[in-house]
Regions:
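Alpha/beta-hydrolase-fold serine-hydrolase catalytic core, especially in secreted/extracellular enzymes
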Residues: 2-32, 181, 351-421
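The feature captures the conserved acid-bearing segment of alpha/beta-hydrolase catalytic domains
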Residues: 127-128, 284-348
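Short substrate-entry loop that stabilizes the transition state in hydrolases
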Residues: 120-133, 138-153, 164, 172, ...
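Domain-level recognition of soluble alpha/beta enzyme cores
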Residues: 21-135, 391
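Alpha/beta-hydrolase active-site loop
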Residues: 154-258
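Short, solvent-exposed beta-strand-terminating loops
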Residues: 75-93, 151-153, 187, 336-355
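Primarily recognizes the serine-hydrolase "nucleophile elbow" in alpha/beta-hydrolase
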Residues: 228-302
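Glycine-rich His-Gly loop
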Residues: 73, 138-142, 267, 313
Length: 421
């Protein structure tokens, strides 16, 4: 079982005082990375906040009912190995199948394009026990994986773990003794009692709603379970990590502010965030990045009474989805929705920074808005919203205008209709 959605656990957010948030870095760093011409990035943006970033993988139980996620957290500054953005070759094969391309040649092409890309976080770095940190659970989209939105979220554990019943998952591990980042002992190593099982991508024929609705319920359960694992760790309970990683989970005891837990998701993960907000009262609010509304029932949407912030791209939402989003927002006076000009559905993912021109022509992964600018707008708007909802003692309210839909790079909201005389 493999993470299917990010669980952004631990610890706060972006830059100005929050631990992480992969953002653009200095102008010199940005220019240095534009070595492929036409402003194309060949690696992910580096963090620019006050905290260095560490990460580790956690598998609490190795069955379908277990939790498998990546945890990003504030760490002490140190040199160390950076995990690969795409951890195993099987992921390239899964991406190829999801994109309806040749598993053989297109996977090799993806490997050549992205094989050297690293996540800008230090593997198994020592946790920075400096203050209690809010917790974010992040859930990614279909055909994605735990690193797919590293640059767009704060800290997260990429949680979701597709099972045989997840028709959209690319190959995933159902059990393993090796973590995905830096090389580690394989399940076939002496003394290992577990075996890997990769789940091939399954296409959905015909009407999608029934399958996707079941699937989003499973993803919600996984996010809730991951949050429970974090709560257990925070309370000092022993959590047996099946993976051999070397990170001391006991260091996390008492440092997570679970009274300030929220859930964030992109696309299908956005639908997950909406349903999770209705299901688990521990989540105080949700942020939805271009959420895919199809898997959700109207009944589920009507149960969401807490604040929700939807950040949409310009081209993805249908008219029906827009109407459902408006009804969803009307259920809480603190809920908001904004649309970023020139953005596309993948603008909220790492692919927008890494995609070469030929791939973008075919798959429209980059919008007309500069990728770094789009990331900054998303990050700043999220931080301003979260400061409101989580009572953060920061200065993120300087971006409140973005939450209200005001800014040159936001699509103006239509004026409310005026009643007749």
């Amino acid at each position: 079982m493999e993470p299917v959605g990010p669980v952004l656990p631990l610890f706060s957010l972006e830059n100005q005082g929050f631990p992480v948030f992969f953002s653009q870095g200095t102008e010199a760093e940005v220019l240095q990375r534009r070595s492929m011409g036409n402003g194309q990035f060949i690696q992910l943006p580096v963090p620019k906040g006050p905290h260095s970033v560490g990460c580790t993988d956690i598998m609490a139980g190795h069955t379908k009912e277990g939790s498998f996620f990546r945890l990003y957290y504030p760490c002490d500054p140190e040199e160390g190995e950076k995990p690969p953005w795409i951890p195993r070759y099987e992921y390239y094969q899964g991406l190829a199948e999801y994109l309806k391309r040749s598993r053989r040649w297109f996977a090799s092409l993806l490997n050549m394009a992205f094989g050297d890309c690293k996540v800008p976080a230090t593997w198994n770095a020592r946790f920075k026990a400096n203050e209690t940190y809010p917790v974010i659970v992040f859930s990614h989209g279909l055909g994605a994986f735990r690193d797919e939105s590293a640059s767009t979220t704060y800290y997260f554990e990429s949680l979701p773990k597709p099972t045989e019943h997840d028709p959209t998952s690319k190959p995933q591990k159902t059990s393993s003794t090796s973590s995905s980042p830096p090389p580690s002992p394989s399940p076939s190593s002496p003394g290992s009692s577990l075996q890997e099982k990769w789940l091939p991508y399954r296409k959905v024929e015909g009407e999608e709603f029934e399958m996707r609705n079941r699937q989003v319920g499973q993803r919600v359960d996984e996010c809730v379970h991951a949050l429970q694992v974090l709560e257990d760790l925070n309370n000092g309970h022993n959590v047996d990590n099946v993976l051999e990683g070397g990170f001391d989970l006991s260091m996390l005891k008492g440092w997570m502010d679970l009274h300030r837990a929220t859930i964030v998701g992109h696309s299908f993960g956005g639908a997950t965030a909406i349903q999770a907000l209705a299901k688990d009262t521990r989540f105080r609010c949700a942020v939805v990045l271009d959420g895919w509304m199809l898997p959700l029932t109207d009944e589920t949407c009507s149960q969401v009474q807490k604040p929700i912030f939807l950040i949409n791209s310009e081209k993805f939402q249908t008219q029906d989805s827009k109407e459902r989003i408006e009804r969803l927002c009307s259920q809480n006076s603190q809920s908001r929705v904004i649309t970023i000009k020139g953005s596309v559905h993948q603008s909220h993912t790492d692919f927008t920074f890494l995609t070469l021109k030929p791939l973008n022509v075919v798959f429209e992964i980059k919008g007309t808005i500069d990728s770094m600018l789009g990331l900054d707008i998303t990050n700043h708007a999220m931080l301003a919203f979260l400061q409101r909802q989580l009572d953060l003692q920061k200065d993120f309210n300087k971006w409140d205008d973005l939450v209200e839909g005001l800014g040159e790079h936001l699509v103006p909201r239509p004026a409310p209709s005026q009643a007749g005389p």
